[in-house]
Amino acid sequence: MKKVNKKTVGSVGEKIAAQYLSKKGYKILEKNFKCKIGEIDLIALYKNQIVFVEVKTRTSVNFGLPSEAVDFHKQQKIVKIAQVYIASSNFKQYQPRFDIIEVYLNPEKLTLEKVNHILNAF
């Protein structure tokens, strides 16, 4: 089995997650939003909510589920970044929501095997 680049796996997963959300009726506002605190993979509007999405992509579950990588520290960081985004945007009236999307890829071809969307993950 060939070794796959983590950055490539991550970017493939984020692209798949954005397409998945778009098909479900979400309007993608930002991809890889960055500020001094860090980065949020996807920011989207859905009905009356502004949704902040952490995408975790894996080619194997040998080291645990993708969502397990979003620990309390990571969650707190995402919340702080979301606060920065909301404060500097026109979306203050929207209810914030924090989701995780797990993307499972075939380790050989990096093709989609499964998407698991965890709503209100934290």
From Swiss-Prot:
Domain of life according to the entry: Bacteria
SUPFAM superfamilies: Restriction endonuclease-like
Pfam families according to UniProt: UPF0102
Single GO MF descriptor: nucleic acid binding
Record family assignment: Belongs to the UPF0102 family.
Protein name in UniProt: UPF0102 protein TTE1452
Organism of derivation: Caldanaerobacter subterraneus subsp. tengcongensis (strain DSM 15242 / JCM 11007 / NBRC 100824 / MB4)
Lineage of the organism: Bacteria, Bacillati, Bacillota, Clostridia, Thermoanaerobacterales
